[in-house]
Amino acid sequence: MLKRFVNSIWEICQKDKFQRFTPVADAIDTFCYEPIHQASSPPFIRDAVDIKRWMMLVVIALFPATFLAIWNSGIQALVYGSGNAQLMEAFLHISGFRSYLSFIFNDIGMFSVLWTGCKIFLPLLIISYTVGGACEVLFAVIRKHKIAEGLLVTGILYPLTLPPTIPYWMAALGIAFGVVVSKELFGGTGMNILNPALSGRAFLFFTFPAKMSGDVWVGSNPTHIKDSLLTMNATAGKSIIDGFSQSTCLQTLNSTPPSVKRIHVDAIASNILHMTHVPTQNVIESQFSIWTESHPGLLLDKLTLEQLQSFVTSPLSEGGLGLLPTQFDSAYAITDVIYGIGKFSSGNLFWGNILGSLGETSTFACLLGAVFLVITGIASWRTMVSFGIGAFVTAWLFKICSILIAGKHGAWAPAKFFIPAYRQLFLGGLAFGLVFMATDPVSSPTMKLAKWIYGLFIGFMTIIIRLINPAYPEGVMLAILLGNVFAPLLDYFAVRKYRRRRI
């Protein structure tokens, strides 16, 4: 029956006035059955797997990230939008799988989470495929070429890079830009220089920055979430320093001014975590001994929040740490990121129980996809490994150089340089970009040496943008797009080196 339906479409398109729609019939036939034509442009597959099946393998690899995008967006919308401070406290203090499952089944409900998450993610997915597909069909009809299968991957990658609160018309505009400008204008699938999904996100990021950053990471109605957080903070008596918020790790990192030093963070951590030794302990104790002359009987690890703020913001001449009073909340927030306190714990970052773009939060889900892509030979493990090495080494060098240059274990170096290098791999969209974006076979290099250099370059630029550039909290998107631009050049020099070695 399906074959008869496809044949009937072919018969209709054979008529003169419908011949321009032949690419549509060909696309339907190719989607349902094996294509009858050979690939004329890259990527070329030298086995029985055609491009459609090859693209479907990438979609399968995205299943874990897609499921967790639905799950996390659902539970976060329910908790943050509940207006219940006790529910929020219970959610933020989950410490293991047993307590997490207990929270889900006793306080929220599994089906409520899935239903809420589907209402957030599925409309964006439908818009992505519908608008992107319409653009593909339009260009195929006008140019009289076949409709390629590239949209199968682009259509699901794109919504996974968006915040859940993005307006639908903006999502449609972004995918249209990605398909038309970054792909079709270059000749279609296999000819594009830039990753179409990332290009669409970059277009939205620079055109509508207020909708792509800030308090946009929970639910589908930012106003409702904001009112709910205000209600919860008022009920729990929270201040701006320790109150509930939508801040992400990278937003906290980006908003931390250079005047917040490592010694400020270490002093706060020693109080919160009751640590007996932090890297700058000697400098802190030296200052604290002077400060306690006017505040007798106080212990560093037993200060109240007001006393801690007084110590950290008092002038150096009085035994304080010299932080501006208006920047104490920034120092308090970055302490959670550096030391993995509360919602920014390493476990939450790895498993994905954090705020962020829909598909980027879970490093675990991305690793599952990476294993599948490497085993099937779809993605290059060289690009993944070199990307991770480049990011890790760059973050580690920032820390080491800060210690060597500033002295005293980097006490007076900017605090943002001391995030553990391994935690940089869990933050933001690094894992998602490493697995699914940087390994795009069309916009990434093809030579082995070029792949190593390409990955190292992207990892290096990601950390540079995160730590140095004050305008952009996340560097993965810009780093990958910049790497795409240099990919042909890297391949060119890699080929020259290979030829010289052969000679």
From Swiss-Prot:
Belongs to the NqrB/RnfD family. GO terms for molecular function: FMN binding; oxidoreductase activity, acting on NAD(P)H, quinone or similar compound as acceptor. Composed of six subunits; NqrA, NqrB, NqrC, NqrD, NqrE and NqrF. The chain crosses the membrane at residues 55-75, 120-140, 161-181, 186-206, 361-381, 387-407, 417-437, 452-472, 475-495. GO terms for cellular component: plasma membrane. This is Na(+)-translocating NADH-quinone reductase subunit B. The keyword Nucleus does not apply. GO terms for biological process: respiratory electron transport chain; sodium ion transport; transmembrane transport. Pfam families: NQR2_RnfD_RnfE. It comes from Chlamydia abortus (strain DSM 27085 / S26/3) (Chlamydophila abortus). Its cofactor is FMN. Keywords: Cell inner membrane, Cell membrane, Flavoprotein, FMN, Ion transport, Membrane, NAD, Phosphoprotein, Sodium, Sodium transport, Translocase, Transmembrane, Transmembrane helix, Transport, Ubiquinone. The modification FMN phosphoryl threonine is found at T248. InterPro entries: NqrB (IPR010966), NqrB/RnfD (IPR004338). It is found in: Cell inner membrane. It is an enzyme of class 7 (translocase). It catalyses: a ubiquinone + n Na(+)(in) + NADH + H(+) = a ubiquinol + n Na(+)(out) + NAD(+). NQR complex catalyzes the reduction of ubiquinone-1 to ubiquinol by two successive reactions, coupled with the transport of Na(+) ions from the cytoplasm to the periplasm. NqrA to NqrE are probably involved in the second step, the conversion of ubisemiquinone to ubiquinol. The gene is nqrB. Its EC number is 7.2.1.1. It is a multi-pass membrane protein.
